[in-house]
Amino acid sequence: MKQIMLHGVNDWRLDEIDDPVPGPRDALVRISACGICGTDVSYVHMGMTPGHPIPLGHEMAGVVEWVGAEVTCASVGDRVVVCPSDAGDGPMGTGGAQGGLTPLLFVPEAANGRRLFKVPDGMDLVTAALAEPLAVGMQSVNQSEAKPGDKVVVFGCGPIGLFAIATLQDRGVDDIVAIDFSHARLELAKEMGAAHVLDPSRDDVWAELKRIHGEAPFMFGPTPATDVYIEASGADSVIGDVPVSYT
């Protein structure tokens, strides 16, 4: 069986691996789609291996091909997404023993009910493979505790930022400012529900935020009256700019 494996810096290979031998608590999923995450790219460029090759791929969807006797959350033929979290052998695709860039994925401990989730009827499996990055965007909103009426800024309109915007909109948060350098991504942000978009290459971000969200008093001077910032750009400058703008 084939599997994309990372061997070192910029050294990924399509390796032949042993066929999986599942047990009564495990499952096998025939992979239909697996996304390539920014994390995968970072792993490849940095050669992030624990001293031995590791499989890649953690955004996957497919069809259940086999289930062990103790697995009750899914049946053969079900269309599912696979949760890549650690089930005892490391997180899938980011250092663990399994990875989604393979035709047939071994899913250990599927019997715990937290590994396989059925895909709704009418949703194609390519779309379903976006469940993992969607979950990351949703969790950022969960952690922010943003609520209707809050003024929210989302830095970065890649997949995670866009899913955060979609989640905010779904939860009744309308005053959303999206920030990115890409015109195409800002257009997508508006489609997802952003009320305002800013491009740092042309806009004075902090001045514009004061204009859009109003000003709040602070001991060292007025700041944007923004309630929640969600950082999804990965840019070091943003991490520094937010506290600086409040001092």
Please state what every model-predicted region is.
Residues 59-61, 78-79, 104, 139, ...:
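Residue-level marker of beta-strand positions
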Residues 40, 165, 186, 239-243:
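Generic hydrophobic/aromatic pocket-lining and core-packing "Φ" positions
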Residues 19-34, 45-86, 111, 120-122:
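Glycine-rich beta-strand-centered segment in the early N-terminal region that forms part
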Residues 160:
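Hydrophobic/small residue at the entry helix of a nucleotide-binding pocket
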Residues 7, 18-19, 51-58, 93-97, ...:
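Short Gly/Pro-enriched turn/cap motifs at secondary-structure boundaries
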Residues 121, 154, 169-239:
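Adenosine-nucleotide cofactor-binding segment
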Residues 86-155:
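NAD(P)H dinucleotide-binding glycine-rich loop of Rossmann-like/cofactor-binding domains
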Residues 246-247:
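Conserved small/polar residues in nucleotide/adenosyl-binding loops
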